[in-house]
Every structure is written in C-alpha cells, then in structure tokens.
Amino acid sequence: MAAPKSTATRARRGRRVVKKNVTQGHAYIKSTFNNTIVSITDPKGHVISWASSGQVGFKGSRKSTPFAAQLAAESAARKAMEHGMKKVDVFVKGPGSGRETAIRSLSTAGLEVGTIADVTPQPHNGCRPPKRRRV
C-alpha cells in the first residue's frame, strides 16, 4: 500500500539570488504609448534588474504617464545598485511619454549616466501604420 502523503509544506525551490559585482552596464528604456519598461544589463547583455510601470503598481492608462516611468526607472536602478552597478550607458527605444523622465530618474537614483543613444527602429516604408484616432 502507498505511503500517505505528508501534510507539511515543503520549502519553495527557486533560483537563488546571486549577488553579482558589476560596476558598469547598459540601461535599456522601452517607452511605448501604453507602458515603460526599464532593463539594466551587464556589458555582455545579461539582465541584472528590470522594472516596468505595471510592475511598480500602475494599471491601465496610468502606466503610460511620465511619473510611472520615473518610479520604474528608480526601482530598476535601486536593484542594480545592490549588485554594485555605478555607471550605465542608456539606450532609449520608442515614442512614449516616459523617455526623458526615466533617464533623469536613473541619474537621480545614483547611477552615473554615460552616453544616451536613441535606438528607436525606423521603418524604410515597412508596415502600414494604424489609422488615426477620431475622438
């Protein structure tokens, strides 16, 4: 006969948080019309920390505000500084409203901003854009 299952809860097995010692890296800010996502990586491209407007606690149309982008960038910067990050090069993508605010809040959080590059993809007359909104 099979042994009865124990009712004791088992400890959750997950990835152990490894503290990396990375002093400089890249910060990628993707700012769309609906959300802002900030990812901070080491120079090889491995993600150290990330945050988005939705993860910080905003829902719906408030995710697209500059204030939500500011809090997301501060959250990502704080997590990265726990791993020893001091200097970042910033790559900004997208047309959203949180671009400049996110860059500013990275520097006010304590990270030294090196270069700032706009890597927004520009189509060579690719896909047809969505139709204009009539409000």
Swiss-Prot record:
SUPFAM superfamilies: Translational machinery components. It comes from the Bacteria. Signal peptide: none annotated. GO terms for molecular function: rRNA binding; structural constituent of ribosome. Keywords: Ribonucleoprotein, Ribosomal protein, RNA-binding, rRNA-binding. One of its GO terms (biological process) is translation. Part of the 30S ribosomal subunit. Interacts with proteins S7 and S18. Binds to IF-3. Belongs to the universal ribosomal protein uS11 family. This is Small ribosomal subunit protein uS11. It comes from Corynebacterium urealyticum (strain ATCC 43042 / DSM 7109).
